Amino acid sequence: MQVQLDAPNIGELEKQYLCRCIDSTFVSTFGPFIGEFEDKFARYVGTKRAVSTQSGTAAIHLALHELGVGPGDEVIVPPITFIASVNPVTYVGATPVFVDIDPSSWDMIPELVEKAITKKTKAIIPVHIYGNPCDMDALTEISERYGIPMLE
């Protein structure tokens, strides 16, 4: 099977921002654009605050920490993913519980997610693979029914 992966789409505006970052010497996870981005993003999603991170790994780690996930807890994840979806689970001391995927979409099977839920389950991390979105309606319904947060 061949999976088509596209190159980044960087337009003129993105190039201008990158040049401004280079000129300001802040080409990192800190600098004058971070606060502005966080404020605009918070307004866009309708919340008081937003926190940006330098990677998806750090974002998942922070979210799990804020949810209080720790040793003895379980987090449901797909087996077909980048390791950054699983490593933060182990960073907080929890156990990743792998739920099989649908071979036609590469996404977790909602019915198997529900079967994997135990008293120790503290989060579900669905991962959209190769442009195929997970069945978020079904996963959201499961998440809400069991009161288990979903990190997407």
Outline where the language-model segments fall.
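N-terminal "arm"/small-domain region of PLP-dependent enzymes with the aminotransferase-like
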Residues: M1-V27
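Solvent-exposed, non-membrane alpha-helical residues enriched in polar/charged side chains
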Residues: C19, D23, E38-A42, H61, ...
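Conserved acidic
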Residues: F26-T29, F33, D135
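Phosphate-binding glycine-rich loop
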Residues: F30-E74, P88-Y91, F98-D100
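PLP-dependent aminotransferase-like
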Residues: H65-E152
